[in-house]
Curated annotation (Swiss-Prot):
It is found in: Cytoplasm. One of its GO terms (cellular component) is cytosol. This is tRNA (guanine-N(1)-)-methyltransferase. GO terms for molecular function: tRNA (guanine(37)-N1)-methyltransferase activity. The gene is trmD. It comes from Synechococcus elongatus (strain ATCC 33912 / PCC 7942 / FACHB-805) (Anacystis nidulans R2). InterPro entries: Alpha/beta_knot_MTases (IPR029028), tRNA_m1G_MeTrfase_C_sf (IPR023148), tRNA_m1G_MeTrfase_TrmD (IPR002649), tRNA_m1G_MTases_N (IPR029026), tRNA_MeTrfase_TRMD/TRM10 (IPR016009).
């Protein structure tokens, strides 16, 4: 899968691309990640990429010419999506990651800055995606989150694909608690059911933990899950 990052700060990605899951996926040939800097497509000696907004107002706006030129310079691998990371976009979810991981072979991620990009650049954008209902100083942070979330769902990236099938949100619920050795740590014991070897009992315990956690910590998700179950039962 190919990822193209349109970014004013390619150095932001140097460490993440050289460590952990992303680096391993690149080394195995499962992913290509390329950074393209709009400054390289400017014509003035100061490599100016922003300007004051028409109509006045605070902040600066990214100019259309260097962004459009950067986007048009990229090779096209189909199917692909061009995504602008923006607080106005649809929120990132596990379902969104799963959809992108299975439906596209190229993701172009446009990292915004300042007050945003000139609206005319939206001609090149397929969709806007947001990390959440808050504002950050740059689009590189949500771009990295999106890259990581999608890439880990691609076949071969994670050793055991069962790992991501059991992730939080994969079935609309939060994850269950995890334990490892030792069986007792500073007086805190692993639940007996996990030591029993009874796979049916373990599965039931984990499901109950998922339900309780989701109900207590994310009642919005729990209500959505209940509604989904009601729909399934009615059919």
């Amino acid at each position: 899968m190919r990822f193209d990052l349109i970014t004013l700060f390619p150095e932001f990605f140097h460490s993440p691309l050289q460590s952990g899951l992303i680096a391993k996926a690149i080394a195995k040939g499962l992913a290509e990640v390329h950074c393209t800097n709009p400054r390289d497509f400017t014509c003035d000696r100061h490599h100016k990429v922003d300007d004051e907004p028409y109509g006045g107002g605070a902040g600066m706006v990214l100019k259309p010419e260097p962004l459009a030129a950067a986007l048009e310079s990229l090779p096209v691998v189909t199917p692909r999506q061009v995504i602008y990371l923006s607080p106005q976009g649809e929120p990132m979810t596990q379902a969104l990651f799963q959809d992108l991981a299975t439906s596209v072979e190229q993701l172009v991620l446009v990292c915004g800055h300042y007050e945003g990009i000139d609206e005319r650049v939206m001609t090149w954008i397929d969709r806007e995606i947001s990390l959440g209902d808050f504002v950050l100083t740059c689009g590189e942070i949500p771009a990295l989150a999106l890259l990581n979330g999608v890439l880990r769902l691609r076949p071969g990236t994670i050793g055991k694909e069962e790992s991501h099938r059991c992730d939080s949100f994969s079935d609309g619920l939060l994850d269950y608690p995890h334990y490892t050795r030792p069986a007792e740590f500073r007086g805190l014991k692993v639940p007996e059911v996990l030591l029993s070897g009874n796979h049916g009992a373990i599965a039931a315990w984990r499901r109950q933990q998922q339900l309780e956690r989701t109900r207590d910590r994310r009642p919005d998700l729990y209500q959505a899950w209940q509604a989904q179950q009601s729909d399934l039962d009615s059919h």
